[in-house]
Regions:
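Secreted/periplasmic proteins that engage bacterial cell-wall peptidoglycan
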Residues: 1-80, 87
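Aromatic- and glycine-rich peptidoglycan recognition patches
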Residues: 3-18, 85-130
Length: 130
């Protein structure tokens, strides 16, 4: 089962709307609160975004990076969660936030990044959260 936005895309925009228990605007807090995703230890790796056809993933679906064991990463190679908008051969368009950004904004995450690019900035590492 995938997780999708429970509110409108417009309603997620704005400073500091999705905070974790420590008051930080982390990516996971956004996906959990806006799409109803459970704690990350319960996340399962679903369809790889780069292998999906243009209509296989619904707009508003929660996506995240996963490691080689199919788990949300705990290593130092990067991790991220976001809300999928669309994708093509060049990038995934998402809504996301991170602590230093402090708010949900749209952005592209590019395919074809060089070796060593952190997962959060490499579209090839994103999968649907199930």
């Amino acid at each position: 089962m995938s997780y999708t936005l429970k509110i409108s895309e417009q309603d997620v925009l704005g400073k500091g709307k999705f905070k974790n228990a420590k008051g930080n605007t982390e990516c996971v807090a956004f996906v959990q609160q806006a799409a109803g995703a459970p704690v990350t230890t319960c996340w399962q790796r679903g369809l790889k975004v780069s292998e999906a056809g243009p209509t296989e993933i619904s707009r508003g679906t929660a996506i995240a990076t996963f490691d080689e064991n199919g788990k949300y990463p705990t290593d130092k190679l990067g991790k991220h969660a976001a809300i999928y908008l669309t994708h093509d051969e060049t990038a995934i368009s998402v809504l996301d936030q991170w602590n230093s950004q402090g708010e949900v904004l749209p952005r592209p995450i590019w395919f074809g990044r060089p070796e060593g690019t952190p997962r959060q900035n490499d579209a090839n590492t994103f999968y649907v959260i199930e």
